[in-house]
Curated annotation (Swiss-Prot):
Protein name: Ankyrin repeat domain-containing protein 13C
Positions of region (Disordered): 1-42
SUPFAM superfamilies linked: Ankyrin repeat (SSF48403)
PROSITE patterns xrefs: ANK_REP_REGION (PS50297), ANK_REPEAT (PS50088)
InterPro entries xref list: ANKRD13 (IPR021832), ANKRD13_C (IPR055285), Ankyrin_rpt (IPR002110), Ankyrin_rpt-contain_sf (IPR036770)
Ranges of the ANK repeats in the UniProt entry: 79-110, 111-140, 144-173
Keyword Chaperone listed: yes
Function per UniProt: Acts as a molecular chaperone for G protein-coupled receptors, regulating their biogenesis and exit from the ER.
Organism, scientific name: Xenopus tropicalis
Domain of life (superkingdom): Eukaryota
Biased composition (Basic and acidic residues): 1-19
Length: 509
């Protein structure tokens, strides 16, 4: 079991203006200094997450309020009334039961917290379970970039972490099913084609540079079927696993049988399932409770594109061929990779053990070699009772909410991401069509990163070559080398007769 299984729970989230381009668990070697922050009891200005300086996204919050709970003219978000949040904050389960029928439980307050965030941070288990029973969103993040699940891990109640994890999986499955009809319709309208692209991974960490892979991927699309051939089986947690792999999506099959992965070397296949056993869920909870809590975003607030230049004496815009396509090269400016790590829920033993694991992985080792087996974790002792009043909380300045829950131990790292992108007007495929194809093959993590990156507002054309962040210390250069329309034999979208099923061949898919 690796961290990839945990990260896979978050794959269908759409990026916001500050792109959630890196999932939790991915900041293996980012720098920074841990800072412990406590409560400021005798001040009207409360400092929450002092080390975290990333502002909230006012536009996103405003849009959310407009959709869910309109604010009357002349009323600011700070002055807005949040009755569901208030009764959760005060632990009024009876009033919550009444309000839940007529009010949105997904609304964010002026600190970006939903009622579920507050219930978890304050340890109000009754309120939290009631909200979950009414399908309160688990994936949503507050202004500091933390989800209710992240806050639950910090609080340390195992039962609550498990309940949130199960609900998150359920909501992820439902989201996939909701998208399926639209996705199939888009694929059907798209012509049949063959697409070849190349991945080249780099890092500024010397030890990592030696073990980073490259990969040539071939994508076949016919009707509502897709096949992806790749040599990169697994690329997570600072390690990579090579092989001869094919991923097949059959749009005509039942959802439970749509996705199949073939191991062409061992001649076995595995269907990608969404249901997990009780033991698998418990193991994931153990890993969550013994690992750092991560939040990483690629801030695009200040993004801009300038034409790349070529020539020594006489400078001119850079235009050259990428594969078969003429492309204009642009420099990507203003991208900042922000990563945060929390570990207030960990013991010194946990921290030393995790550090040893990451050092081994950075040198080319893997979890299997270390006989890694998560230890069954018990609930932590609850943090001291909350002393902040509702009035103090809701009237605090945006982005400076008084801290609720366990005292923070947090580290932040910011890194400017320098990138180049080549846009071609000649490429036959549009970005929207590419997004639909990439959404199908999102179980492969690096493809999910590509999908999220190209959703940004790019210069005109199709991105035939681009640099994207995959992990905080690792980037990838993706090159679209070949594209052609054509028809293919049905056999390439089916499981060969001599392949045998192995349900456990790819445990992280």
């Amino acid at each position: 079991m690796t961290g990839e299984k945990i990260r896979s729970l978050h794959r269908d989230q759409k990026p916001s203006k500050d792109e959630d381009l890196l999932e939790p668990d991915e900041e293996a070697t980012a720098g920074g200094t841990f800072t412990r922050t406590g409560k400021l009891k005798n001040s009207k200005m409360f400092s929450n997450h002092k080390v975290i300086r990333s502002p909230s996204n006012p536009a996103l919050l405003q849009n959310h309020h407009q959709q869910i709970s309109p604010i009357t003219p002349g009323e600011s978000k700070t002055d807005a009334y949040f009755p569901v949040h208030e009764c959760v904050f005060k632990g009024d389960i009876r009033r919550l039961s009444s309000l839940i029928r007529s009010h949105s439980i997904g609304q964010k307050d002026n600190h970006g917290n939903t009622p579920l965030h507050l219930a978890v941070m304050l340890g109000n288990k009754e309120c939290a379970h009631l909200l979950l029973a009414h399908n309160a969103p688990v994936k949503v993040k507050n202004a500091q970039g933390w989800s209710p699940l992240a806050e639950a891990i910090s609080y340390g109640d195992r039962q609550m972490i498990t309940a949130l994890l199960r609900k998150l999986k359920q909501q992820s499955r439902e989201s996939v099913e909701e998208k399926r009809p639209r996705l199939l319709k888009a694929l059907k309208e798209l012509g049949d084609f063959y697409l070849e692209l190349h991945w080249d991974f780099q890092s500024w960490v010397p030890l990592l540079s030696r073990i980073l892979p490259s990969d040539a991927c071939k994508i076949y699309k016919q009707g509502i079927n897709i096949r992806l051939d790749t040599t990169l089986i697994d690329f997570t947690d600072m390690k990579c696993q090579r092989g001869d792999l094919s991923f097949i999506f059959n749009g005509d099959a039942a959802p439970s049988e749509s996705f199949v992965v073939l191991d062409n070397e061992q001649k076995v296949y595995q269907r990608i399932h969404h249901e997990e056993s009780e033991m698998e869920t418990e193991e994931e909870v153990d890993i969550l409770m013994s690992s750092d809590i991560y939040s990483a975003t690629l801030s695009t607030k200040s993004i801009s594109f300038t034409r790349a230049q070529t020539g020594w004496l006489f400078r001119e815009d850079k235009t050259e061929r990428v594969g078969n396509f003429l492309a204009d090269f642009h420099l990507v400016n203003g991208l900042i990779l922000e990563s945060r790590k929390r570990r207030e829920h960990l013991t010194e033993e946990d921290i030393l053990r995790n550090k040893a694991i990451m050092e081994s992985l950075s040198k080319g080792g893997n979890l299997m070699e270390q006989n890694f087996e998560p230890v069954r974790r018990q609930s932590l002792t609850p943090p001291p009772p909350n002393t902040i009043t509702w009035e103090e909380y809701i009237s605090a300045e945006n982005g400076k909410a008084p801290h609720l829950g366990r005292e923070l131990v947090c580290k932040e790292n910011k890194k400017t991401f320098k990138a180049t992108i080549a846009m071609s007007q000649d490429f036959p495929l549009g970005i929207e069509s590419l997004l639909n194809v990439l959404e199908v093959i999102a179980p492969f993590k690096h493809f999910n990163k590509l999908r999220e990156f190209v959703q940004m507002k790019l210069p005109p054309g199709f991105p035939v070559k681009l640099d994207i962040p995959v992990f905080p210390t690792i980037t990838a250069t993706v090159t679209f080398q070949e594209f052609r329309y054509g028809e293919f034999e049905d056999a390439i979208f089916t499981i060969p007769d001599d392949y045998k099923e192995d349900p456990s061949r790819f445990p992280d898919l």
